[in-house]
A protein has these predicted regions:
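A subset of signal/propeptide-processing and intrinsically disordered low-complexity segments
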Residues: 16-17, 72
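Exported/periplasmic ABC-transporter solute-binding proteins
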Residues: 20-54, 58-68, 75-78, 82-251
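Bacterial N-terminal signal peptides
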Residues: 3-15
Length: 251
């Protein structure tokens, strides 16, 4: 009922917009594929254009503190949005969980990944790609997984760090690492099918839940288009897209 109210409010708000605007949205790298579809739907309904800037959540935090022109942040964690609100860089009471991410062990090679637990324990590979745990929440989740399942000291010498989850994926896709811990959304299509290679979905008991929060930043506080997108992100059309890419949804 709450989401229905949000969507009705959005429809009314869009009717009052005289012309389309462009909204600057900083998007955690794992969420780019669904975001492209969501922003297309939003443009069709509202006339507003979304400018997607993708990267690591930790890096976005630093850029926002330095005055970057982002109006909305779609983070890969909960803490960053909360911190920005507490520090006065984002609007209070606008943060919400838009997706719950899932981590996968993925290889571009078919049949390379079957039993992920056994593969990580044996560590018979040369390189494993992991996002920088200091900048990327998916990297922190990957590090937790490796420490839980494998001999981390032995694995550490094999780790290749990507600045964000997109670069981590590229290391594996190009063969610079035999496998990597990446986001499920990166390796499946919009119908939930594996696009290529082989994967093992990491059980969520091995890492802290990847709850991903959006927040309206100060630069978007007075922008009708930014507020409209925050509402649209919680609408049923957006939620259906998010779910198709393998994410969990908040109630």
């Amino acid at each position: 009922m709450i989401r229905l109210g949000i969507f009705i409010g959005l429809a009314v708000g869009l009717a009052t917009v005289a012309h389309g605007e462009e909204v600057q949205v900083a998007v955690a790298a794992n969420f780019v594929a669904p975001m492209q579809q969501i922003s297309a739907g939003f443009k069709e309904r509202s006339g507003h254009q979304i400018s997607i800037i993708s990267g690591a959540t930790g890096k976005f935090y630093a850029q926002i503190k330095a005055g970057a022109p982002f109006e909305i942040l779609l983070a890969a964690d909960v803490a960053t949005a909360a911190k920005l609100v507490a520090e006065g860089d984002a609007v209070a009471n606008t943060s919400f969980t838009y997706a719950i991410g899932k981590l996968v062990l993925w290889s571009a090679r078919e049949n390379f990944v079957a039993d992920g637990v056994d593969l990580l324990k044996r560590a018979t590979f040369d390189h494993i790609a992991v996002a920088n745990p200091k900048l990327a929440p998916y990297g922190a989740a990957a590090e937790q997984t490796l420490k839980t399942l494998g001999d981390y000291e032995a694995l550490a010498a094999k780790i290749v760090h990507g600045e964000n989850i997109a670069q981590t994926y590229q290391f594996v896709a190009t063969g610079n690492a035999e496998l990597g811990l990446v986001a499920l959304s990166q390796v499946i299509d919009e119908n939930g099918k594996l696009k290529s290679g082989s994967m093992w979905i990491v059980p969520q008991k091995f890492y802290t839940p990847l709850r991903q929060n959006a927040v309206l930043l100060n630069k978007g506080a007075e922008r009708a288009a930014a507020k409209a997108f925050m509402a649209y992100l919680q609408s049923e059309p957006a939620r259906r897209i998010i779910e198709r890419y393998g994410y969990g949804l908040p109630p």
